């Protein structure tokens, strides 16, 4: 952190690369067990694909594509996994809305609009562990037989969008994304959609209408 920055030094500060800024994190609580944020704030962790794979990344995707889709939905139900919005809606229940034999195209949308002022729960993941988000989406796509997915990100978050775009290209280069992923005979693409900054688009139906 930079302290006592005077107006005349502002131009110097703007020249410092963002990667050189380090925000200190408090030590974890003795009873804390991080899951989603287990890689957030680590000095030895970077956002590139190689680092993610070294830390166990995409292992769960490999496991998922070896399982029957219905078994994945049942496992998610049993886990009690919930959405990270205010409602905390059970993920497995939402997945169950899709019929196993659905003939119409099904699309997956990740709501990364995060329009609540002062909320950073999504941006932490996007900026510091983007491949975790992508892997979760790919597992969801496999479980629901979805071939096209979107990440709807707020227009005011251009850096986050760029990070996700780079991560998607890395994943595609390693065959985690695109045609016949991991030799499973399954095609899936993820697209970034930048919103226009409307607050209402953080709500599910408003987001879908905007998209």
Indicate where each model-derived feature is located.
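Feature of Fe-S/electron-transfer and energy-metabolism proteins
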Residues: 1-211
């Amino acid at each position: 952190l930079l302290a006592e920055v005077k107006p005349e030094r502002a131009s110097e500060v703007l020249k410092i690369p963002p990667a050189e800024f380090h925000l200190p994190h408090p030590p974890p609580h003795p009873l804390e067990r991080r899951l989603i944020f287990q890689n957030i704030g680590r000095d030895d962790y970077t956002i590139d694909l190689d680092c993610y794979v070294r830390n166990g990344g995409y292992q769960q995707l490999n496991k998922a594509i070896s399982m029957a889709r219905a078994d994945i939905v049942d496992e998610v139900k049993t886990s009690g996994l919930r959405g990270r919005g205010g409602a905390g809606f059970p993920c497995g229940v939402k997945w169950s809305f899709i019929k196993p034999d659905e003939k119409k195209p099904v699309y997956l949308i990740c709501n990364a609009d995060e329009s609540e002022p002062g909320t950073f729960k999504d941006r932490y993941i996007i900026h510091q562990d983007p491949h975790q988000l992508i892997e979760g989406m790919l597992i969801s796509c496999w479980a629901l037989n979805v071939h096209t997915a979107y990440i709807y990100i707020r227009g005011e978050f251009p850096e986050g969008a760029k990070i996700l775009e780079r991560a998607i290209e890395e994943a595609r280069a390693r065959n985690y994304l695109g045609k016949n992923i991991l030799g499973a005979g399954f095609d899936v693409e993820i697209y970034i959609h930048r919103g226009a900054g409307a607050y209402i688009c953080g709500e599910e139906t408003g987001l879908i209408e905007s998209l």
